[in-house]
Curated annotation (Swiss-Prot):
Reaction catalysis annotation: (S)-malate + NAD(+) = oxaloacetate + NADH + H(+)
InterPro entries with a match to the protein in the record: L-lactate/malate_DH, Lactate/malate_DH_C, Lactate/malate_DH_N, Lactate_DH/Glyco_Ohase_4_C, Malate_DH_type3, NAD(P)-bd_dom_sf
Protein name: Malate dehydrogenase
Enzyme Commission number(s) from the entry: 1.1.1.37
Source species of the chain: Nitrosococcus oceani (strain ATCC 19707 / BCRC 17464 / JCM 30415 / NCIMB 11848 / C-107)
Chain residues that bind NAD(+): 10-15, 35, 97, 120-122
Keyword tags: NAD, Oxidoreductase, Tricarboxylic acid cycle
First-level EC class: oxidoreductase
Keyword DNA-binding: no
Gene name tied to this protein: mdh
Active-site residues per Swiss-Prot or TrEMBL entry: 177
Length: 311
């Protein structure tokens, strides 16, 4: 699929930052920012459009509350929803964000039925599954952003501890986007060299815990807002892989249909991202301990899915 038009639903901090990344990196020709609150998307779009001469991009940016403008979108990125507050988990916002995603998907199905859909709204694992079940589309077309961000956070922490270039660090995080995520140390390297060659286990464990709580750390420090620059950069990285059909292996929230021994659940797993969306899931060999941790992450998501079923 040639990505020409992208819609971002939700013109909050993540949505606006994502729009900036996309146009500055020339990842679309037309971008629509949509928000339920009148004036928010329009103002953000106008601000971004006026930076075009300074950043030298030609994309046309439009803000609106009208879903009719999303017609012919190749990709819809959903960032809308109630944000977390200090002390809240990602699951705590499920009740508020479930009807928001349902309404958005109804409009996407009506006005952009040919599009790919990327879910960013938390809890992203549960809401990705809900969006997929609600629309009934092929799983390649509905996926979530989480693992790219979590892996980037882990890589940045590793760079800080080792003093080495983050460009040479390859980190891999599986599982849910939260406390049960599974940073895979065996698959984390620096220029192909295992991480354990550079750091002892105590430091690695500290990095793992900091990665698991990376979003909360920012929320605790800022108080009034959660992370938005790094999530937006992660979204842009995924869009780049799709737009340019790069066939990159990135950790994405994908619908599992037998992979890793699981069905009917959305989880963060290594996936091939290309022009057709999430084209393939890569199954990594896991140790017995890693399998147990992965299963624990699945069970945590299934708990939220059971709550969703009762909603």
């Amino acid at each position: 699929m040639a990505i020409k038009k992208i819609t971002i639903v939700g013109a909050g901090r993540v949505g606006e930052a994502t729009a900036q990344f996309l146009v500055k990196n020339e990842l679309c020709r037309e971008l629509v920012l949509l928000d339920a609150q009148e004036g928010v998307a329009q103002g953000a779009a106008l601000d971004i459009q006026q930076s075009a001469p300074l950043f030298d991009f030609d994309a046309r940016v439009t803000g609106s509350t009208n879903y009719e403008l999303i017609a012919d979108s190749d990709l819809v990125v959903i960032t809308a929803g109630k944000p977390r507050k200090p002390g809240m988990s990602r699951s705590d916002v499920l009740d508020s964000n479930l009807p928001i995603i349902t309404d958005i998907m109804n409009n996407v199905m009506r006005f952009a039925p040919q599009s790919l859909v990327m879910i960013v709204t938390n809890p992203v694992d549960v809401l990705t599954y809900h969006a997929w079940r609600h629309c009934g589309w092929d799983r390649a077309r509905v996926f979530g952003q989480a693992g790219v961000l979590d892996s980037a956070r882990m890589a940045s922490f590793i760079a800080g501890e080792t003093g080495l270039s983050v460009k040479d660090i390859s980190a891999m995080v599986l599982g849910g986007h939260g406390d049960t995520m599974l940073p895979l140390i065996r698959y984390t390297t620096i220029s192909g060299i295992p991480l354990t060659h550079f750091l002892d286990q105590q430091v690695i464990e500290k990095i793992i815990e900091r990665t698991r709580h990376g979003g909360f750390e920012i929320l605790r420090l800022r108080q009034t807002s959660s992370a938005y620059d790094a999530p937006a950069a992660a979204i842009a990285g995924m869009v780049d892989a799709i737009r340019h059909n790069r066939k990159r292996i990135l950790p994405c929230v994908a619908i599992l249909q037998g992979e890793y021994g699981e069905n009917e659940v959305a989880m963060g797993v290594p996936s091939v991202l290309g022009g057709d969306g999430l084209e393939r899931i890569v199954e990594l060999p896991l140790t017995e301990e890693e399998q147990e941790q992965f299963k624990h992450s699945v069970e945590a998501i299934r708990t939220d899915l059971a709550h969703l079923a009762r909603a």
